[in-house]
Amino acid sequence: MPLSTQPPASGERYVLTACLDNARNLSSLLRAVHFQDHATCFATANGLKVTVEDAKCLQANAFIQAEIFQEFAIQEESVMFRINLAVLLDCLTIFGASSLPGTSTALRMCYRGYGYPLILFLEEGGVVTVCKINTQEPEELLDFDFCSTNVVNKIILQSEGLREAFAELDMTSEVLQITMSPDKPYFRLSTFGNAGSAHLDYPKDSDLMEAFHCNQTQTNRYKISLLKPSTKALALSCKVSIRTDTRGFLSLQYMIRNEDGQICFVEYYCCPDEDVTEADL
C-alpha cells in the first residue's frame, strides 16, 4: 500500500501530515539552507517553510508549497517546531547509495504536536523505515522586515550568470560589494582580495538579465562568509531575483525546479556589512 494512502494508527491524531512520492524533492531544498545544524519548521495551509539563521545577520527560507506534496493536511492554523536539520537530512536519505537507478524514496511525515517527535515513514522497494526525530521549542526568528514597498532595486538573472561570477570572483575578499544603478555600470559585483580589486559588470541588456528595475544607484557591502551558504541554493536554481531595500538589506530569491518539474523557492536575507561612501568607490 503506498505510504500516501496508509491510514494513521488508531487513536493517533496528527496536526500535520505530509506525503511525497519522491523524498528528494524535500531533501534537495533542505540542503540548500543547511549551513547550521538546526532549523525552524513553520507549516500553514499554504505549505511548509523551513528557516535557518546565522549570527542574526543571515536568514534562509526554503518554501515547499502544499501543491508539491501528494498529500498535505494541517489541523491547526499553523504548526511550528525546531528540529535538527542534519539529522532530518540523514533520515531523508537513509536509503542512500543503495537506491537503484530510477527509483525514489516515498515519504510520509507526521507530527502530533508540541512536545512530540517528527515521525518519518520512508519506503523504497517495499522496505519501510520509520524515523522519530525529537522536536524542540522554536526560537524567535529574525524579522528582516523586507517588504516590497521598500525595495529600491530589483533584477532577475539567469542563475548561470551568477554561478560564473562566484567562480571568477576573488573569494579571499572579506566582502562582496554590490552596485545596482539605473545607469552604468547597472549591476556590478566587486571584491577586494589578496590579488587586488576585481569587478564584474552585467549590462542591463545582457542575455542573462531577465528583468531590470533599478530606481537609484545603491552600493552595499556584504560579508562573503554570510553569502557563501547561498551558493548551495544557487547551484540548484535556474533563476535568481536580487533585491535591495532602502536600508541596503539584500534579498536573494532562488527559483528551483525539482525532479518533477515543479517550482520551489529558497530565499536568503542578508544585512549589509557597512555603508560605502563615494570616497570608497
Regions found by a protein language model. Name each.
Residues M1-T172, T179-L281:
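DNA polymerase sliding clamps and clamp-related checkpoint/processivity subunits
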